[in-house]
Amino acid sequence: MKVRASVKKMCDNCRVIKRKGKVMVICSNAKHKQRQG
């Protein structure tokens, strides 16, 4: 899980979602998981 000020899609499988007010990226590639903070 990467924590970044700006989260971006890193590939076509990445999905930008909101969970509990936090912007997150979920992906089939675990290295692409990100959370805003």
From Swiss-Prot:
<keyword id="KW-0687">Ribonucleoprotein</keyword>
<dbReference type="GO" id="GO:0005840">
    <property type="term" value="C:ribosome"/>
</dbReference>
<dbReference type="InterPro" id="IPR000473">
    <property type="entry name" value="Ribosomal_bL36"/>
</dbReference>
<dbReference type="Pfam" id="PF00444">
    <property type="entry name" value="Ribosomal_L36"/>
</dbReference>
<dbReference type="GO" id="GO:1990904">
    <property type="term" value="C:ribonucleoprotein complex"/>
</dbReference>
<comment type="similarity">
    <text>Belongs to the bacterial ribosomal protein bL36 family.</text>
</comment>
<dbReference type="GO" id="GO:0003735">
    <property type="term" value="F:structural constituent of ribosome"/>
</dbReference>
<keyword id="KW-0934">Plastid</keyword>
<keyword id="KW-0150">Chloroplast</keyword>
<keyword id="KW-0689">Ribosomal protein</keyword>
<dbReference type="GO" id="GO:0006412">
    <property type="term" value="P:translation"/>
</dbReference>
<dbReference type="InterPro" id="IPR035977">
    <property type="entry name" value="Ribosomal_bL36_sp"/>
</dbReference>
<protein>
    <recommendedName>
        <fullName>Large ribosomal subunit protein bL36c</fullName>
    </recommendedName>
</protein>
<dbReference type="GO" id="GO:0009507">
    <property type="term" value="C:chloroplast"/>
</dbReference>
